[in-house]
């Protein structure tokens, strides 16, 4: 039933799943097995894990203040590609395509953490590079909060607030295009998508 689906992972996760799997114009089959799989892979291990890791590192290494840093080309390019893909998808009411743009940026940002190894940069006292990495991750999260707002409004708002941003992410398209977040005070939110 709908009630048990909402209880299982929350209303935003169900909304995301239905938009991603079915959209507006398609018939779809719902299974708890598929709902659980998408929740775990894309939300808990994807967006939730990214937000948790990135915000925890900004807290740990920079006292919760987003540093100013140069552009991290690979992550910036991924963010711009995600924005373009998302805009095209939403203009065509392709909600699955919009969700795929979000997942693509989440995947890129999680991979960026692995490759850039902020913990190693901190240990090596490479402050300039660490600042650039943390700033790039914060910018990616701003973009993700804006992109997620139509599909998961409550979770996007929680991420937006954790990023120290005023207002709501659904009014932030310009912020997604040019995320100026340096100097913002971030807090690690309560786990956005708890793992089962």
Task: Give the residues covered by each predicted segment.
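Catalytic adenosine-cofactor/nucleotide-binding cores of aminoacyl-tRNA synthetases and other
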Residues: 1-70, 166-193
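Secondary-structure capping and boundary motifs in well-ordered enzyme cores
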Residues: 5-6, 35-46, 71-79, 91-101, ...
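Conserved, charged catalytic cores of large soluble enzymes
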Residues: 51-86, 110-126
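Short hydrophobic "helix-edge" motifs at membrane interfaces and signal-peptide entry regions
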Residues: 1, 82-84, 142-144
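Basic, alpha-helical terminal appendages of large translation-related enzymes
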Residues: 28, 88, 93-94, 103-196
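Short, charged/polar, low-complexity loop and linker segments
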Residues: 27-32, 80-88
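Short, hydrophobic, well-ordered secondary-structure elements
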Residues: 44, 48-58, 99, 103-106, ...
């Amino acid at each position: 039933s709908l009630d048990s689906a909402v209880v299982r992972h929350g209303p935003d996760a169900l909304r995301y799943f239905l938009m991603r799997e079915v959209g507006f114009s398609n018939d779809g089959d719902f299974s708890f097995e598929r709902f659980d799989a998408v929740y775990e892979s894309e939300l808990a291990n994807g967006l939730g894990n990214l937000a948790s890791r990135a915000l925890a590192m900004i807290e740990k290494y920079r006292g919760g203040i987003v540093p100013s840093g140069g552009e991290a080309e690979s992550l910036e390019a991924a963010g711009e590609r995600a924005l373009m893909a998302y805009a095209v998808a939403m203009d065509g009411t392709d909600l699955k395509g919009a969700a795929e743009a979000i997942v693509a940026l989440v995947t890129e940002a999680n991979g960026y953490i692995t490759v850039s190894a902020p913990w190693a940069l901190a240990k090596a006292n490479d402050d300039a590079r660490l600042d650039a990495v943390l700033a790039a991750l914060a910018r990616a999260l701003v973009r993700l909060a804006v992109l997620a707002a139509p599909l998961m409004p409550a979770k996007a708002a929680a991420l937006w607030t954790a990023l120290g941003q005023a207002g709501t992410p659904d009014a932030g398209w310009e912020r997604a295009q040019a995320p100026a977040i340096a100097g913002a005070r971030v807090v690690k939110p309560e786990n956005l998508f708890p793992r089962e």
